[in-house]
Amino acid sequence: MSTAQPFTRHDVSFTSGEDTCAGWLYLPTGVASPPAVILGHGLGGTREMRLDAFAERFAQAGIAALAFTYRHFGDSGGQPRQLLSIKRQLADWDAAIAWVKARGDLDAARIAIWGSSFGGGHSITVASRHPELRAAVAQCPFTDGLASALALGPSASLKVLPTVARDFASIVGRRAPTMIPLAGPPGSPALMNAPDALPGYEALLPTGTTFRNEVAARVAPTIMAYRPGRVAKKIKFPILFCVSNTDSVTPPAQTLRYAHTAPRGEIKRYDAGHFDFYLGEAFEALVRDQVEFLTRQLNSALPQDQSSDVRSH
């Protein structure tokens, strides 16, 4: 039976644009120049919402882990607060990669990325733009905004339009953004309103959190237009897709279609809901598969032989 590697956690920050992203860097003790994995969360999520649980397991496997919070959220910089900009979040990923590469205590030639939900979509996009990376993990990934909107139904999309219109008016009038809930009960005008969305989101919040369940409504149209799954076919290195068979937020059928286009993709499927991935038995099964994948892809200093890739269903 393997013994978990001890690690230390450090509060860090890095520059992105004119602001800073806050993060936690997990360093495995006694490992010289370890490989690294960068973790980013989903829609409005911050690193306190269980990214630490994944990062700890990776560090225990001898892999350094950087879990960061996007600008405009949590303790990262950026004004106005609660602004979700896909362009800026992708720039945060670029900045995180550059920061890891520049550190002398990490192996710049062995870097992976890990994203969950909306961040899983970002990991697909970022992987397609950074061929120098070694591996990627896309956990219950958001792959197609149109498919997600259709899964919710047209009435749900229509309910958010008045709030979106008011937020765009606030831009013109230079007023504070008009907010919309990230997660809400079924039928509510929220970005996620599946039956498990609100309780699932709240289950990820640590005690005493100051997390705000809201985001500037102007993001809604850009989410619908965001289809990161389309670039999966451009990813040159191994990527692991962890797919929920009962996902209420990111339709699994569409995710699987895109995952099959990744030349070196691996697929793992789970009978657990979108928000179940972060806790309990589902988390244990998931993180075990992810540790195996990342260890396999990052431990060798030489490029993996493409013929050794495994596609599991």
List each language-model region with its residue ranges.
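The serine-hydrolase catalytic nucleophile loop
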Residues: 44-56, 70, 253
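N-terminal cap/lid segment of alpha/beta-hydrolase-fold proteins
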Residues: 1-32
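Catalytic nucleophile-loop/oxyanion-hole region of alpha/beta-hydrolase
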Residues: 17, 47-50, 73-108, 112, ...
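Catalytic active-site module of serine/aspartate enzymes centered on a nucleophile-bearing elbow/loop
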Residues: 271-313
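Alpha/beta-hydrolase-fold enzymes
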Residues: 124-204
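Conserved alpha/beta-hydrolase
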Residues: 57-77
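Short beta-strand/loop motif that positions the catalytic acidic residue
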Residues: 235, 241-243
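Conserved alpha/beta-hydrolase "acid-adjacent" motif
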Residues: 248-254
